[in-house]
Amino acid sequence: MTSRELYTSSYKKIFGDWGRSSSLLYTTNSSSSTRSQSYRPREAYTSNISSYRKVSRSPGHLSSAQDHFDLSQSTALSNELKIVRTNEKEQLQGLNDRFVTYIEKVHHLEQQNKLLESEVTLLRQKHSEPSRLSHIYEQEIRELRSKLEEQEQDKDQAQLDYEHLGACLEQLKLKLEQESARREEAEDVMKNYRKDLDQATLNRLQLEKKVESLLDEIAFLRKVHEEEIAELQASVQEAQISVEMDVVSKPDLTAALKEIRMQYEVLSARNQQSSEEWYQAKIANVSLEASRNNDSVRQAKEEITEYRRQLQARTLEIDALRSANESLERQLQEAEDRSNEEMSHLQDTIGQLDNALRTTKEEMARHLREYQDLLNVKMALDIEIAAYRKLLEGEETRLTSVGGGSMFGIGYPFSSGSYSGGRSSTTSTISIRKEEKKESPEGGKGGSSGQPKTSKPGDQEKISQKAAAN
């Protein structure tokens, strides 16, 4: 059972039938209905006074009054009672008007409290959703940062590979220069060998010509020698014939001819041997020079072939290294472009996520500010409601303690038109108010759903003073 129902039930018990119509008018929240309703308690009040007078003039009550008071005291008490009744009538009229206003304010504040609770629930739901989104964004940002670190590591590794390939390329360029220098040296040596080969070929041709001329000369000399021998033989034969003819007369000529012939034979043999030795020596020298030149030419040809083979191998190796270098440079460029593109994409994604996170944080801060404002408003409303309740309870306590049984008969309508009925309704109203007072902290805790309900005593006193001034 809510506090509003308690207020309505207690109000019905106190004010009777006109309280039912006034409670219906309170829900409309209009000033005209409040003003028109404020006059009904006055009519009820006058009817209550008349009923109280009827009850007070009953014989049972007059007999009990004559037992306790004398006539003079009863006259003074009746005058004082009239004055007190007049004052109480005015006070009760003002209190009824204020009570109606307080009831309206309480109903309005309860409606606002419900609206604020619904708004707080929505804000809590919205607050939980951005926290979940921020958690997702932070996780995605961590993943992207890890990917970015991996890309940076890959980039550093690619940079190291690029530097290593650059060093290898420099070494290959140095080797290429060295091999080019060696090739030039080999070409120079080959040119020198070619010159030597040409010179050796010329020498060989000259020697061959010289050999041919020497062979011709040898043949000529042989021919001359043979002719000389033939002439000598002919001359010897003639000399023999002449010697034979003159043998008797000249006995020493034969011996002389023999001696001359022997000398010529020795001379011709010596000349033939020397010419043959010279010819053989020349042939041997020419053959040696030719073989020597052939060996040098063959060695030069072999060296040229080896240099050509090495040059071709180095050229192929240089071409392969150039193609590998170009491929690596192209791969490195593609990797750099890809890493730059991924870096830019990751930077854009990080920027978008940062913007979304910033927007979410701003929205969360705005919701928290609104939530704090609503909490402050709700706390102020709770404090004001508590102050109004304390004022109402204080008024009820004061009214019940000041007037006693006579005040209940004056201030509130009786259910059966008798004093005992007014007393029972007043007692039930007081008990209901006490129960509301006991249950009000628990109801405030249950309706706040975890929101702060406590307030400073100074604030409550200020609010109660303002309410009393109003």
Curated annotation (Swiss-Prot):
Q: Where is this region: Disordered?
A: 414-470
Q: Map out region (Coil 2A) in residue numbers.
A: 252-270
The UniProt annotation puts the region (Coil 1A) at 91-123
Similarity section: Belongs to the intermediate filament family.
Q: Can you name this protein? A: Low molecular weight neuronal intermediate filament
Q: Which UniProt keywords are given for this protein, alphabetically ordered?
A: Coiled coil, Intermediate filament
Q: Which GO terms describe its biological process?
A: intermediate filament organization
Segment Linker 12: which positions? 233-251
GO CC, any one term: intermediate filament
Low complexity: bias regions: 414-431
Q: Which Pfam families match?
A: Filament (PF00038), Filament_head (PF04732)
Give me the ranges of the annotated region Coil 2B: 280-395
Spell out the molecular function terms from Gene Ontology.
Answer: structural constituent of cytoskeleton
Query: Which InterPro entries does this chain map to?
Result: IF_conserved, IF_rod_dom, Intermed_filament_DNA-bd, Intermediate_filament, Keratin_I
Q: Does the keyword Coiled coil apply?
A: yes
Query: Per the record, which residues fall in region Linker 1?
Result: 121-136
Q: Where is this region: Linker 2?
A: 271-279
Tell me the segments the record calls region Tail. 396-470
Where is the stretch described as Coil 1B?
137-232
Tissue expression, per UniProt?
Answer: Nervous system; in axons in the PNS and in small perikarya in the dorsal root ganglion.
Q: Where is this region: Head?
A: 1-91
- Domain remark in the UniProt entry: This protein contains a central IF rod domain characteristic of IF proteins but displays divergent head and tail domains.
